[in-house]
Amino acid sequence: PIDTPALEYLEILIGKGSEETDRQLYRFQDHGGRDVGMRFDLTIPLARFAAQHIHSLGLPFKRYHIATVWRGENTQRGRYREFMQCDFDTIGSLSVATDIETGLVIHNLLRALGFEEFTIRLNNREVLNGLLEKLDLADSAPAIA
């Protein structure tokens, strides 16, 4: 895992999500008077990190990250201002195998946590076509447009 800072310069965070996300940012000035915000997800800090370090990391670059994120929204059932988020990311691969690998990582994680029955949904036609080909079922399955 690669940990990224909980605080980012506000210019890194603003405009990367929706207007709603921008409104939910916890923002303030640090001791140097710079505008900063608390990360609302783990993807934007990863993108900044990758832009700075990808030349030394190599591609494809894979990582997982479990960390706290913050959102300034009204608390209600299932919605919190501070919560843990888990990301599994791959940068630099256009292969459908990456999506399949992500599903397998989720499967193995849930099994390791003791879950026996669960459903994983992947919304990618290319993944389904790839699985059908791998299982030699592509010719016998109905075409998916």
Roles of regions detected by a PLM:
Residues 1-145:
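Extended, charged alpha-beta segments that form solvent-exposed binding/catalytic grooves
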